[in-house]
Regions:
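Glycine-rich phosphate/cofactor-binding loops in nucleotide/flavin-utilizing enzymes
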Residues: 2, 75-76, 94, 231-248, ...
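C-terminal helix-coil-helix/basic helical segment that borders enzyme active sites and/or dimer interfaces
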Residues: 28-36, 268-278, 292-348
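Internal helix-loop-helix
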Residues: 43, 50-118, 160-166, 291, ...
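Glycine-rich beta->alpha junctions and the first turn(s) of the following alpha-helix
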Residues: 3-7, 195-294, 366
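Hydrophobic, small-residue-rich alpha-helical packing segments that form membrane-like cores
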Residues: 133-134, 149
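A short, Trp-centered hydrophobic/proline-enriched beta-strand micro-motif
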Residues: 118-126, 170
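A structural signal for short hydrophobic beta-strand segments in well-ordered beta-sheet cores
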Residues: 140-143
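A short core secondary-structure module
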Residues: 147-148, 152-198
Length: 392
């Protein structure tokens, strides 16, 4: 594979850099680091992106997108990540494409334009207190009652469950079927009186929620795909999510650049610059190598997408490498920043307005978001390498 940007990709990257610099001024995300302000900043920015026509750059034109190639779509996500632009990744790259493939015409007509405009956002309702890694063990029930389902149950780690407009909800519609059967996908509005959630504060500085469903009535018309065949939709959506999480890992490239610049202008008591220390250069070099390898893997993934040849094991491999590279690079950058690294926003001497510390704490999320990395390794060994499947 020959890696060279086309003139169109170069123009797109240049246009995006100028646009994102105006949309999200330098260090804007750090200035909105308090959770409530983060969420308001996120929704405002997403609506602006939608009104300016920048959401869905890779969506087909028939659904209101720009119809750009996977390579050009990756350029968009790459530049957005490095500029610190928040994106509705679940709605844009997971739920939307799955509705395109499996949804009814009515569902497409209602949801897709609203996703592209930034009007609605989604949370993912998969994991449960007793069904996380083993997702097929989910128990949230949906009982058919005429033209509606009555939903009862609980989900956990429902990111954006307190701010999203809809939940992409996995429910069990046939309790007597085998674990991977009898699951259906429903579109559940969060303004239903039977929906509630509790915010969970995490050490990573990332809010998530536990969400509850008490006699929530969902029209059958809001079921995506056939009844009891939701597992196929879940795996389709998770492949999209794993690819998205890998692309999102390019945020570490910006962190590396910023820490390198900080080390070049910061002097020690003896007058030497931080970057003049041999071990610092080795750490920065190692981080560059890891991120360059991640970039090449991402482009290999994009090439497979363009050829419609992306396999589950390839998606898992890119997700594992990208998420672990991001975590490792942030750890190395924290070493370089030394005592100033752990300082949060607002503290005297905080590196990069506290963004480095926040990025270090949040990096761990990507190792289990979209599927725990240990499970991804099992997918790689079982499907990709033909090794015996792990027994559970």
């Amino acid at each position: 594979m020959h890696l060279r940007s086309t003139p169109q990709q170069q123009r797109l990257r240049s246009e995006l850099r100028s646009y994102f610099a105006e949309l999200v001024p330098e260090n804007a995300y750090a200035r909105h680091a308090e959770p409530a302000r983060q969420k308001e900043f996120y929704r405002r920015t997403v609506r602006r992106l939608g009104s300016d026509g920048w959401l869905g750059v890779g969506w087909p034109t028939e659904y209101g997108g720009r119809g750009l190639t996977p390579a050009e779509q990756f350029v968009f996500f790459d530049e957005a990540a490095q500029a610190g632009v928040p994106l509705p990744l679940m709605a844009l790259n997971t739920v939307g494409p799955t509705i395109m493939q499996f949804g009814t015409e009515e569902q497409k007509a209602y949801f897709l334009p609203r996703i592209l405009s930034g009007e609605i956002d989604f949370a993912i309702g998969y994991s449960e207190p007793d069904a996380g890694t083993d997702l097929a063990a989910l128990r949230t029930r949906a009982v058919r009652d005429g033209d509606t389902y009555v939903v009862n149950g609980q989900k956990i780690w429902t990111t954006n469950g307190d701010t999203a407009d809809w939940v992409w909800l996995a429910v069990r519609t046939d309790p007597d079927a085998p674990p991977h059967k009898g699951i259906s996908m429903l579109l559940v509005p969060t303004d239903d009186p039977g929906y509630s959630c509790t915010v969970i504060r995490t050490l990573a500085g990332h809010d998530t929620t536990a969400s509850y469903y008490e006699n929530v009535r969902v029209p059958v018309s809001r079921r995506v795909g056939a009844e009891n065949e939701g597992w196929r939709l879940i795996t389709t959506q998770l492949n999209h999510e794993r690819v998205t999480l890998a692309a999102h890992g390019t945020m570490a490239i910006r962190a590396l650049r910023d820490v390198r610049d900080w080390a070049a202008r910061t002097r020690l008591d003896d007058g030497r610059r931080v970057i003049d220390l041999g071990w610092v250069r080795r750490r920065l070099a190692a981080a560059h190598v890891r991120l360059e390898a991640m970039r090449l893997l991402n482009w290999r993934m994009v090439d497979a997408l363009q050829r419609s040849a992306l396999t589950p094991q390839d998606a898992s491999a890119v997700k594992v490498y990208g998420s672990e590279a991001r975590r490792e690079v942030y750890a190395w950058l924290m070493e370089v920043a030394a005592a100033a690294g752990p300082l949060r926003e607002g503290s005297a001497g905080a590196v990069l307005h506290g963004e480095l510390e926040r990025g270090y704490r949040s990096a761990v999320i990507f190792t289990f978001g979209g599927g725990n990395n240990e499970i991804q390794r099992e997918i790689i060994s079982w499907i990709g390498l033909g090794m015996p499947r792990v027994r559970r």
